[in-house]
């Protein structure tokens, strides 16, 4: 579990660097994001990296002021990753109850809703959602569960 979190954190940092650089310079990040997706292909964080880099790509056209946006997005990202990290410990070690999942979903949703009126609202909503999806993917993988409930939401 610790290795998974370290890998996810490293991948997030690499994607964040591309995202921040692209927002500041206006450079097209498609190739850099594709290289990151290739780098993590076949690893446990492949789905997470794919989803996160796509969010970053989708957000770039929405950014009006890179400095303000990136400061807000960094704060959101740190909060979301803390939910991810704390929840992953439970996902990797225990059977999850509906109450456990509801707490994770609420914690992630609260971050999205608390940024509803900010420039980073789409980033906050999307990133918090992929964290819940990623935790579910890992839980299913670890416990060999085949149902993909999130495909029906």
Predicted features, each with a name:
Residues 16, 74-95:
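Amphipathic, heptad-repeat alpha-helical segments
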Residues 1, 28-36, 45-52, 100-101, ...:
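Extended non-catalytic scaffold regions that mediate assembly and binding
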Residues 42-74, 119-146:
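Repeat-associated, polar segments at repeat-unit boundaries in modular proteins
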Residues 4-11, 15, 65-80, 145, ...:
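Disulfide-bonded cysteine-rich modules in secreted/extracellular proteins
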Residues 20-28, 41-46, 91-96, 113-117:
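Charged, low-complexity interaction regions
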